[in-house]
């Protein structure tokens, strides 16, 4: 047998997958244009130590390291704590930030609950102050938008305030009847309020003592006859518990909302763009999230359980002033924010408000302009009197004061007294006489807002609002797949949203920095 010689030469470096190679410096492996370096550039400019609370017990992981890992995870839209734990074992960037530590998901959970919660707003402010200084952010212009985000609550766990009020009224009526029966049977009178559950509880105890003193036997189990006193006694106990439940539900709803979720009491049921039943208008538990942007960065965050954006504008702007000690010069928002209070607030704080009002777009349609019966299209004489399409005059009737607004608001009520003989009455009004409510101050504020919105600067600002404010929600919801809140309770939800916005701003800083480098 002839010997065969293999002349195939290999020019590949010997590869042994388990061979240790030096140096073990992960910073040499990470790309110099990686977002981690931009992240460290911002975070290292902040004194994170002052946000760390001291604690007793064994020394845990380095809190600065933990905070960096969590912020970097949210910057890369990694929200699951188990996913963060896995990243610390497999991703060299997280391994570099951890410095060979391997925190568990519970360690991250404890750190978020004990250290970040309560400090998230201050950390967000510090990060934004550094970014504004480095990127020279134009904070004079502020774009505002709001959205409803689904809460981490069961979809059928609703509690309605009106239902609780109706049930409470029925329960009070039954309690009054039951106490009346017990008074006749035991001669023990009740003089307190029927809404006082503690007093009713004391009355129940007195009934029980009366039964013990008079040797009234309580039948237990099925098939045993109960005395009238026992039946009324047990009925009153059930009704008192029902009354407590109704009062707790009404108190949980408060004065500003009409519903809440049993799973998350801070979540409110509201309409959203998408629901579980093919957009049939089913309510879902959620939170109202308000964001304000300047130069593509999120400048302010607010979470509330309000169902509309109108009432959130003033507290949102107050929180902005508290955060940065100044108000923006220009505020741009959509029609959800145009109201009497918001216009007056902008006037008071010397803010140029580009706030759309409710019918801003509809006023430009042909249908609106052709509707001669709308109060906006009625003729107005020099002396201020209104003239209907038939030439009939409206007479000033009275002033109506709106007590629900934050600023004094007086509406003029005008009435046409000759509508009975008008041939066009059916097309004009269904009432006996046509009444028109006019607020001259609000009309003046709307006219000023329309002038701003229709100007060239207003058109450009409205376009930028669509790009920046609505675009931010588009990135967070669609690109980052964050369309449902993970935690429960207002404080936890605020903490989570602050982390999301900090991660967004850190990634936006890196992206804008790369644009400047590569341009």
What are these regions (language model features)?
Residues 25, 29, 38, 43-47, ...:
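Short, solvent-exposed coil/turn linker segments
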Residues 29-71:
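Basic, short loop/linker segments at the boundary and entry of helix-turn-helix/winged-helix-like folds
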Residues 8, 53-57, 457-460:
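A ubiquitous short alpha-helical element
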């Amino acid at each position: 047998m002839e010997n065969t010689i293999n002349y195939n030469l290999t020019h590949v470096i010997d590869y042994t997958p388990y061979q240790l190679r030096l140096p073990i410096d992960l910073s040499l492996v990470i790309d110099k244009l990686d977002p981690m370096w931009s992240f460290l550039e911002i975070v290292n400019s902040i004194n994170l130590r002052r946000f760390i609370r001291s604690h007793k017990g064994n020394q845990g992981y380095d809190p600065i390291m933990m905070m960096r890992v969590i912020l970097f995870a949210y910057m890369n839209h990694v929200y699951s704590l188990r996913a963060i734990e896995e990243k610390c074992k497999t991703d060299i960037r997280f391994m570099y930030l951890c410095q060979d530590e391997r925190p568990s998901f519970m360690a991250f959970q404890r750190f978020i609950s004990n250290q970040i919660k309560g400090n998230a707003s201050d950390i967000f402010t510090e990060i934004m102050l550094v970014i504004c200084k480095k990127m020279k952010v134009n904070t004079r212009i502020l774009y505002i938008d709001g959205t409803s985000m689904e809460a981490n609550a069961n979809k059928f766990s609703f509690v309605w305030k009106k239902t609780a009020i109706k049930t409470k009224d029925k329960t009070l009526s039954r309690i009054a009847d039951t106490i009346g029966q017990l008074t006749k049977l035991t001669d023990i009178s009740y003089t307190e309020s029927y809404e006082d559950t503690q007093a009713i509880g004391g009355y129940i105890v007195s009934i029980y003592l009366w039964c013990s003193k008079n040797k009234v036997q309580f039948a237990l189990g099925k098939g045993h006859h109960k005395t009238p006193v026992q039946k009324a006694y047990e009925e009153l106990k059930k009704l008192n518990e029902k009354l407590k439940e109704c009062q707790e539900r009404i108190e949980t709803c408060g004065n500003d909302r009409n519903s809440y979720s049993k799973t998350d009491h801070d979540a409110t049921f509201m309409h959203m763009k998408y629901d579980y039943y093919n957009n049939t208008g089913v309510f879902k538990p959620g939170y109202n999230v308000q964001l304000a942007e300047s130069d593509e960065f999120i400048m302010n965050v607010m979470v509330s359980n309000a169902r509309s954006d109108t009432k959130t504008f003033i507290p949102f702007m107050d929180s902005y002033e508290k955060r940065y000690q100044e108000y923006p010069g220009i505020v741009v928002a959509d029609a959800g924010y145009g109201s009497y209070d918001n216009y007056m607030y902008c006037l008071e704080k010397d803010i140029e408000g580009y706030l759309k009002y409710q019918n801003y777009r509809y006023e430009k349609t042909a249908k609106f302009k052709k509707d001669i019966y709308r109060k906006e299209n009625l003729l107005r004489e020099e002396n201020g009197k209104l003239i209907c399409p038939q030439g009939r005059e409206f007479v000033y009737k009275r002033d109506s004061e709106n007590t629900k607004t934050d600023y004094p608001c007086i509406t003029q009520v005008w009435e046409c007294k000759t509508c009975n003989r008008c041939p066009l009455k059916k097309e004009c009004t269904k009432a006996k006489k046509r009444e028109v409510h006019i607020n001259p101050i609000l009309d003046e504020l709307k006219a000023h807002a329309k002038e701003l919105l229709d100007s060239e600067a207003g058109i450009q600002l409205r376009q930028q609002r669509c790009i920046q404010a609505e675009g931010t929600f588009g990135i967070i919801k669609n690109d980052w797949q964050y369309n449902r809140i993970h935690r429960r309770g207002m404080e936890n939800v605020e903490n989570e949203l602050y982390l999301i916005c900090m991660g967004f701003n850190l990634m936006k800083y890196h992206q804008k920095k790369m644009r400047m480098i590569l341009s």
